Swiss-Prot record:
Pathway(s) where this gene product acts: Cofactor biosynthesis; thiamine diphosphate biosynthesis
Source species of the chain: Bacillus subtilis (strain 168)
Family: Belongs to the ThiC family.
Positions contributing to substrate binding: N197, M226, Y255, H291, S311, R312, G313, D352, G353, L354, R355, E391, Y418
Residues annotated to bind Zn(2+): H395, H459
Protein's name in the database: Phosphomethylpyrimidine synthase
């Protein structure tokens, strides 16, 4: 592990955007400090003088990386923000934990210099007979510091947060062994969230690249991260990511379990899988994607599909079921998995192993048969007070999207829905971040709680840093559009502020209020790079004479100067121009 290269790679990430600063809103106690990004705005100027514009505060996922007062050494990890809250509840205990084995990283014998140097504390687990999930506390009527933190972030009451979690309509992914994470919530009555996938593979990428991608993704707005590593150094890569990640981290444990049996699905066992769950639980993974709904009798339903089974986890479990001609150990041992989850407060992300991989397969019998089983498993998890969200498709044309949400809400009793897109057409490799963002905005509007991003590299290759940025921004647009359509409180404040800045030609404010300030500035400066252009009352699209907003502004100024309404000003101006035309000889061409 080249520690210096990781540190160097993150230097550019550890800064806020231009015109912004990190601010904190304090809760009921001094240790509840909720981060927000405050965007300063310049005053409105005109013939009337100056009028101040209040700063705009926006949701911030970047963690302490963008706080100039915080020094971060990624070899040591972030400070354990939630450690005191977790231990003060008195229901957890330290223990030695399992020893790290060479096979955890995909080796037959230990490889030197790949372990994470920073973690010194022992793992935590629930004391015997205790349940440490946020859902358990919520059902008991307890408002935790995590819930209060979230209430401030979401501009709702702590009691509302508690009630949504208790009902199962929302989850707070918060493993007690990931105290570095800043509490967040996933539920349809809150801001639509987005997830970014990272992870190495047997073909490409490294620990350095994945840590950099993580910090890069949260800078641009990723609400959670999923580490989907499948190559070597899986355990160590995950440790580096979790120790330095201020947002929840999810995984698909079957990927690592498969590596431990050299990629032979038939050789997987419950014992190997269980050991992998505990390994990742002790590291601090906040939610597990588990494809427990892939049943033996559902596999034949995929035989006539255009694209068969496209989920990696789903294909692994289908292969195991066929080889052993029995139901998967994920299904038969589901209650035991629940026992593990509630010891660490890990949320289920019940995987859609039979999701459609093409629009031709959307909403078919296999997809909805699995959904019925996910609904049954949700009820079992809730009996253990384990938090659950449900994964969804996939590839779905626009006219079939709403049916997915309606069925999921009914069958899974409003557990949060977490979808990959969906892609609304299959003809645009290289642009699937766009084909999927169309579906993501729609499904978010209908009630999906979290959207898994898609990058331009989808179906083509492993995304690099630039692809991650493109995917995150694209999905922030989709999520925000859904928030606006749902009428989420305060969602339109930023839009209105940017629209006002645009009308008043406050170019710097326009850049700073945008989801990607750097791209907005870059595109503006390609044609108008001079500093004076940042105050000009036009852009290169229309030029100074044809700018509709400048003309509108001139009308307003004229109306104010002549004590007229805007309609009267337009009418008066038309009469003056008509008289000017007649006075100059009524010639069309001068």
């Amino acid at each position: 592990m080249q520690n210096n290269s990781v540190q160097q790679a993150n230097i550019s990430i550890m800064s806020s955007f231009s015109g912004s600063k990190k601010v904190y809103v304090e809760g009921s106690s001094s240790d509840i400090q909720v981060p927000m990004r405050e965007i300063a705005l310049s005053p409105t100027t005109g013939s009337f003088g100056e009028e101040e514009n209040a700063p705009v505060r926006v949701y911030d996922t970047s963690g302490p990386y963008t706080d100039p007062e915080v020094t971060i050494n990624i070899q040591e990890g972030l400070k354990p923000l939630r450690q005191k809250w977790i231990t003060e509840r008195g229901d957890v205990e330290e223990y030695e934990g399992r020893a790290i084995k060479p096979e955890d990283n995909g080796y037959k014998k230990a490889k030197p210099n790949v372990s994470y140097p920073g973690l010194k504390r022992k793992p935590l687990r629930a004391k015997a007979g205790q349940n440490v999930t946020q859902m358990h506390y919520a059902k008991k009527g307890i408002i935790t510091p995590e819930m209060e933190f979230i209430a401030i972030r979401e501009h709702v009451s702590p009691e509302f947060v508690r009630d949504e979690v208790a009902s199962g309509r929302a989850i707070i992914p918060s493993n007690i062994n990931h105290p570095e994470s800043e509490p967040m919530i996933i539920g349809r009555n809150f801001h639509v969230k987005i997830n970014a996938n990272i992870g190495n593979s047997a073909v490409t990428s490294s620990i350095e690249e994945e840590v950099e991608k993580m910090t890069w993704a949260i800078r641009w707005g990723a609400d959670t991260m999923m580490d989907l590593s499948t190559g070597k150094d899986i355990h160590t890569t995950r440790e580096w990511i979790i120790r330095n990640c201020p947002v929840p981290v999810g995984t698909v444990p079957i990927y690592q379990a498969l590596e431990k049996v050299n990629g032979v699905a038939e050789d997987l066992t419950w014992e190997i899988y269980r050991d992998t769950l505990i390994e990742q639980a002790e590291q601090g993974v906040d939610y597990f994607t588990i494809h427990a709904g892939v049943l033996l009798r559902y596999v034949p339903l995929t035989a006539k599909r255009t694209t068969g089974i496209v989920s990696r986890g789903g294909a692994i479990m289908a292969q195991w079921c066929l080889a052993h001609h029995q139901e998967s150990f994920l299904y038969t041992h589901f209650e035991e998995i629940c026992e593990i989850m509630k010891m660490y407060d890990i949320a289920f992300s019940l995987g859609d192993g039979l999701r459609p991989g093409s629009i031709a397969d959307a909403n078919d019998e296999a997809q909805f048969a699995e959904l019925e089983t996910l609904g049954e498993l949700t009820q079992i998890a809730w009996k253990h007070d384990v938090q659950v969200m449900i994964e969804g498709p996939g590839h779905v044309p626009m006219h079939k999207i709403k049916e997915n949400v309606d069925k999921q809400m009914d069958i899974c009793k409003e557990a949060p829905f977490y979808t990959l897109g969906p892609l609304t057409t299959d003809i645009a490799p290289g642009y699937d971040h766009i084909t999927s963002a169309i579906g993501a905005a729609m499904i978010g509007w209908y009630g999906t709680a979290m959207l898994c991003y898609v990058t331009p590299k989808e179906h083509l290759g492993l995304p690099n840093r630039d692809d991650v940025r493109e995917g995150v921004i694209t999905y922030k647009i989709a999520a925000h559009a859904a928030d606006l359509a749902k009428g989420h409180p305060g969602a339109q404040i930023r839009d209105d502020a940017l629209s006002k800045a645009r009308f008043e030609f406050r170019w710097r404010d326009q850049f700073n209020l945008s989801l990607d300030p750097e791209r907005a500035l870059e595109y503006h400066d390609e044609t108008l790079p001079a500093e004076g252009a940042k105050t000009a009352h036009f852009c290169s699209m229309c030029g100074p004479k044809f700018c509709s907003m400048r003309i509108s502004q001139d009308i307003r100024d004229y109306a104010k100067k002549n004590d007229l309404s805007e309609a009267e000003a337009i009418n008066k101006g038309l009469k003056e121009k008509a008289k000017e035309f007649v006075d100059t000889g009524s010639n069309l061409y001068q």
